[in-house]
């Protein structure tokens, strides 16, 4: 068994009802060009593979990657053992011939830089379904004038239409984080929208 590593900010999702809720929100279809960032122990991976038929996954932890490859390598998993902050999403979208659907229970310690890395090439990304610390999701999805509205909201709003889908308690993870999480859908605009 592979244990969570603090340096990678790992908390593994294990709650089947939360997993089902996330899969329902994503609504993956056969042939969707799905990329899972940080699949960890594969909590979402199996259901995503079953729905889409194939899946690209980016995992930085070599031990987890080896386990994922052993379990899903012959079932349509295309594993990239690398740092998502250095991954070329535009090249993958070009190879697939379609805009990517990004899924991720993102490590909280790299979430903001990763979002900006993804949005450097908005034409490559269709949407993102992400789980982050609840306070970060609230800031991403904030309405102008609310107490959560701030720099992150302003920087992302031109590029995404953000929707806070649902909250996830600490008990859904092992080890349990000290904070609540939330899932959001970010629909990416190919051109920025300015108010």
Where are these regions (language model features)?
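Catalytic cores of RNA-modifying enzymes
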Residues: 1-195
């Amino acid at each position: 068994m592979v244990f969570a590593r603090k340096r990678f900010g790992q908390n593994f999702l294990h709650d089947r009802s939360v997993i089902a809720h996330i899969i329902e929100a994503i609504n993956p279809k056969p042939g969707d060009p799905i990329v899972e960032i940080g699949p960890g122990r594969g909590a979402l991976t199996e259901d995503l593979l079953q729905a889409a038929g194939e899946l690209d996954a980016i995992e930085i932890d070599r031990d987890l990657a080896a386990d994922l490859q052993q379990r899903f390598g012959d079932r349509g998993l295309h594993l990239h053992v690398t740092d998502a902050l250095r991954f070329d999403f535009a090249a993958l979208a070009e190879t697939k011939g379609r805009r990517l659907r990004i899924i991720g229970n993102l490590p909280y310690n790299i979430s903001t830089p990763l979002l900006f890395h993804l949005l450097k090439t908005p034409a490559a990304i269709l949407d993102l379904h992400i789980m982050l610390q609840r306070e970060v999701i609230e800031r991403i999805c904030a309405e102008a004038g609310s107490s959560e509205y701030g720099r992150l909201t302003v920087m992302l709003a031109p590029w995404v239409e953000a929707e806070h889908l649902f909250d996830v308690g600490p008990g859904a993870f092992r080890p349990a984080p000290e904070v609540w999480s939330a899932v959001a859908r970010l629909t990416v605009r190919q051109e920025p929208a300015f108010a």
